[in-house]
Each structure stands twice: as structure tokens, then as C-alpha cells.
A protein has these predicted regions:
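Active-site glycine-rich loops that stabilize anionic/oxyanionic intermediates
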Residues: 23-26, 92
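The conserved beta1-alpha1 loop
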Residues: 19-23, 216
Length: 274
């Protein structure tokens, strides 16, 4: 089963669960602070922070490492939880996994996509930083005497300290110091699936009774003008809601946490409140 942790508001008795999915090379801890704020505002929800396959503590899962497999992992997790999964929120790669999961679960009442393109992206536009990070991890090796040595190597490859610190979250203690716990080849395979999958149908033909919300960074490049127009057309006929966070880049929740919390809290309102 996927590694996960559950966030609820103290004293609350939630009646449903929302899966929270990180982006590529992330982990379940990425959304912990914001999840506490979500739970405070929506105590009826439990927020299940997930380590997707080959990320965080969810290592060693059987291949193939595909988008379908990642969504299947979620189905297994959902079946094991005490609360019914009625919502799923994902950022970037995690959002694409959320869309794939939603395609197979019509009873899902809430779908929140954070800065991800529902369509295929053969040009890999907007994910340059993640691709560069994978190239760096391939180039610098997996074992390090100290965390600082790893940080220095990542920065020497052209990344800033913030990116280096983020990548260092994938280090674990080893006999000789630290080692990278992720299988870079497996992560590349997952990312290939992310770019290849076209899941516009999940947004454009959502089942009745589902609230779909897309939260986009105003300064992000994951969607071009025609794709934004296509999304606006879906929103105009009531098929989804679109929230653009001005000035925020791809990591919307990092650049604008307050705006992200407000958007997610609104997105998780009862469907009858539309």
C-alpha cells in the first residue's frame, strides 16, 4: 500500500476523505501545512497525504511505472481507508494522476487540479525545471557523504539553493552518509506517462454531481492560449471552475499559500452549493 498520512481538524468527525497528491519528485509532506488549514476550514473532510509510487516512502513497487499504475495504487489505498474517498486534489504530476483516478471513479464528488494541463504535452512545455532536476540527479550520482555535499553538487549544476533543498528531501541516511532514495529511471517513466496522457475528457465530460476546479498560476506556462480558451469554454457552460492566482508560478501553493487555501476551501464546498 502507498505510504500516507491523514490530517484532520482536532476534535472533528470527518465523513469523507480527500486524497492529496504531490508533484514529481515531491512527497506527502509537501502539502502537510496547507492540509491542516484545509481541515480547519472544512472539518467534514479528512485529508489523506499520499506518497505516490516511487516517491517518498512508497518505494519498490512493481513496474510498469505508468500513470495507470499510479491511479491503480490510489484505488487500492482508497479501498483500505475507513472513510469513503469523495475528493482528490493533485498538483502537477499528481494532478494528472488525480484526473486518471477520477476517470475510473464517477462517484467522486470533488476534483481539484492545481497547475496541470489535462491534455498531452509532447513538447513538455512548462516542466523544464523538473526535467532539469532529473538530469542533474542522473549526472551527480546517488550517494553522498553529507547533505551539504549533495546541495553543493546540485547548485554547481546550475540550480538555486531552494531547488537543491527540495531535491535533498529525497535523501535518506545510509551507512556512508546519505543516498538518493528515488529511482530516477522509474520517475522518468512516470513523467513520460504524464506528458503522453490526454485527459481532457475528464474535465469536459465530468459526471453529474461532480465539482471540478482548476487552480492555475497566473505566471505558469503549463497551458497555452488555445488551451486556456478551451478550459474557459468548459467553465462557461458550467463544467468546471477556474481560479487563476495572479503572479504565482507552477508551484502555486508555495508562491501563494493563502490564495491556494482560499481556492481549495471553496472548491471543497458541498456540490449543492454551486
Amino acid at each position: 500500500m502507498l505510504s500516507h498520512s491523514i490530517v484532520t481538524h482536532p476534535g472533528a468527525r470527518p465523513t469523507r476523505a480527500c486524497l492529496v497528491l504531490h508533484g514529481i519528485l515531491g512527497s506527502k509532506t509537501n502539502w502537510r501545512t496547507l492540509a491542516r488549514r484545509f481541515a480547519a476550514a472544512r472539518p467534514e473532510w479528512a485529508f489523506v497525504l499520499v506518497d505516490l509510487r516511487e516517491h517518498g516512502a512508497s518505494q519498490g513497487l512493481h513496474p510498469p511505472h505508468t500513470l495507470d499504475a499510479a491511479a491503480g495504487d490510489l484505488a487500492g489505498l482508497a479501498a483500505a481507508l475507513d472513510l469513503p474517498v469523495r475528493g482528490v486534489l493533485g498538483h502537477s504530476f499528481g494532478a494528472k494522476v488525480a484526473l486518471r483516478f477520477a476517470a475510473d471513479h464517477p462517484a467522486l464528488s470533488h476534483l481539484v487540479v492545481v497547475d496541470a494541463n489535462p491534455g498531452a504535452r509532447p513538447d513538455r512545455r512548462g516542466s523544464e525545471a523538473s526535467l532539469a532536476a532529473l538530469d542533474t540527479l542522473d549526472a551527480i550520482g546517488a550517494e553522498w557523504p553529507t547533505r551539504e555535499a549533495f546541495l553543493a553538487a546540485v547548485m554547481a549544476a546550475g540550480h538555486d539553493r531552494g531547488m537543491a533543498a527540495w531535491l535533498a528531501m529525497n535523501l535518506e541516511h545510509a551507512s556512508a552518509g546519505f543516498r538518493l532514495r528515488v529511482d530516477v529511471a522509474a520517475v522518468r517513466s512516470l513523467l513520460d506517462g504524464y506528458f503522453q496522457a490526454d485527459l481532457w475528457s475528464v474535465v469536459e465530460a465530468a459526471p453529474a454531481g461532480r465539482r471540478t476546479t482548476l487552480i492555475l498560476g497566473g505566471a505558469s506556462g503549463v497551458m497555452d492560449a488555445p488551451e486556456l480558451a478551451r478550459l474557459d469554454a468548459v467553465a462557461a457552460r458550467g463544467g468546471c471552475e477556474v481560479v487563476v492566482v495572479p503572479g504565482a508560478g507552477h508551484w502555486v501553493h508555495v508562491d501563494a499559500p493563502d490564495a491556494t487555501v482560499a481556492a481549495v476551501v471553496a472548491a471543497l464546498a458541498p456540490v449543492s452549493a454551486r
